[in-house]
Amino acid sequence: MSTPAADGFRMPAEWTPHERTWMAWPGPNPTFDHPDDLAESCRAWADVARAIRRFEPVTVVCGPGRSAEARDLLGPGIDTVERDLDDAWMRDIGPTFLTDGKGGLAAVDWTFNGWGAQSWARWEHDAKIAAYVGDLAGAKTYASKLVNEGGAIHVDGEGTVLLTETVQLGAERNPGWTREQVETEIHAHLGTSKAIWLPRGLTGDYPPHGFGTLGHVDIVAAFARPGVVVAHHQPDPAHPDHEVSKEVIGLLKAATDAHGRRIEVVEVPAPTVLEADGHWADYSYINHYLCNGGVVLCGFDDPRDETAAGIFRRLFPERTVTLVDARTIFSGGGGIHCITQQQPKN
């Protein structure tokens, strides 16, 4: 059986041109278990979609009968389609898109099991969304037996991928898989050749701190360009992520990429708030989304919002940085990057 890499496909970096962005619309489920929570979440998702639509097309997958409500909040110019959904995190349930540099488009359909079969998760329908979206996009779909999500990987487009040990190597997702087997599967499906492993994610991403993914990398570290990584920095020693971020930053600074370059780390300070919803806050500016000509950045009505925006403006001077309040999204277990999935131009 062929693999994407063997067929000439690779995952391009997020900063390369996009054809469109895919999202999923919130519906009644354990994540949004009260009508007020659901209504607030729909407004938050719509705010993100509208911010992205300024820069590129957006398609939102809605549960049956929910597209009319979605369009009312989304406004004009955003497409909707209907399909059975369990949740609304398109980064994780959607496909990982690949290109071959010759006009071809492919999609990886990772195995999805509700972020490690967590007690609150439902995934009967979400496990089928990647293949559905890939088909709508006209992509050649490759299925992988690896339990993985889009928020658990971040690539530089030049052969390097960021991973976390508690996700791909966790018994909740891939019992019996060795590190070497995981790397082989990842490289075969992303076209990468070097993995940089981080030990874990942020504290709030694990039980008992509400809804979490057990350590997704896209809230901790992300490539800004080849050889340069933005990393979450918690400056307050009262927060357990002070030690977590110090360890992650140290590992990144000691790492090299697929081309042997030493990683340059740009530290982005966490918002000042330490707790949210009765748990340690995992608010992070790292969970941003790059779209054509824009950076959609998580905002928290926090004094450090503008500090973070300034860092991203310096990193991406050719892009418009837009802050969108992400506190409601984070209360459900993720951020702006978690609810978006880019389809690259092919």
Swiss-Prot record:
Ranges annotated as spanning the membrane: none
Query: Which InterPro entries does the entry link to?
Result: Agmatine_deiminase, Peptidyl-Arg-deiminase_porph
User: Catalytic site residues?
Assistant: 338
An example molecular function term from Gene Ontology annotations: protein-arginine deiminase activity
User: Known HAMAP family for this protein?
Assistant: Agmatine_deimin
Using the record for this protein, list the coiled-coil segments as residue ranges, or answer none.
none
Q: Which reaction does it catalyse?
A: agmatine + H2O = N-carbamoylputrescine + NH4(+)
Q: What is the similarity comment for this entry?
A: Belongs to the agmatine deiminase family.
Give the gene symbol: aguA
Q: What is its EC number?
A: 3.5.3.12
Superkingdom = Bacteria
Q: List the keywords (alphabetical).
A: Hydrolase
Instruction: Report what the protein is called.
Output: Putative agmatine deiminase
Tell me the Gene Ontology biological-process terms attached to this UniProt entry.
putrescine biosynthetic process
